């Protein structure tokens, strides 16, 4: 998994690509979000448009990132999950936990 961080006003957008799985993608997401929080960036959007697979470790890391951001006074929101990733998120009811957006501008404006 690869992560690229972009700045959009006071929001950091993390463009993720690849598989969010145990021992790979979950570590990339954890490290990227942790570094952003350490730098004081509390409003984070994870762009999932190029994530083609997520397993239980990836799901767990999404929840952990949201909790870490909330503890720092921020939030993590999701952008453009693929149909297969959205299906997994909805099966485990994370579509009720995360704000999920189809448009980047809406996600940015939600903060």
Where are these regions (language model features)?
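Short acidic-hydrophobic, aromatic-tinged amphipathic segments that line or gate anion-handling sites
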Residues: 99-103
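Short beta-strand/loop segment at the start of cytosolic alpha/beta domains
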Residues: 1-15, 35
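A short acidic, often aromatic-flanked loop/helix-cap motif at beta-alpha or helix-coil junctions
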Residues: 12, 106-109
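Short hydrophobic/aromatic patches at helix-to-coil boundaries
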Residues: 1, 108-111
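Amphipathic alpha-helical interaction surfaces in cytosolic regulatory modules
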Residues: 20-98
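Acidic phosphotransfer microenvironment of two-component signaling modules
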Residues: 83, 105-106
């Amino acid at each position: 998994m690869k992560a690229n961080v972009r700045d959009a006003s006071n929001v950091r957008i993390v463009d993720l690509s690849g598989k969010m799985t145990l021992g790979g993608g979950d570590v990339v997401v954890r490290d990227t979000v942790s570094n952003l929080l350490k730098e004081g960036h509390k409003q984070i959007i994870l762009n999932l448009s190029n994530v083609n697979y997520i397993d239980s470790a990836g799901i767990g890391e999404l929840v952990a990132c949201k909790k870490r951001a909330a503890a720092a006074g921020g939030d993590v929101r999701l952008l453009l999950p693929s149909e297969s990733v959205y299906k997994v998120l909805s099966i485990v009811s994370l579509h009720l936990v995360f704000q999920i957006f189809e448009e980047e501008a809406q996600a940015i404006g939600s903060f």
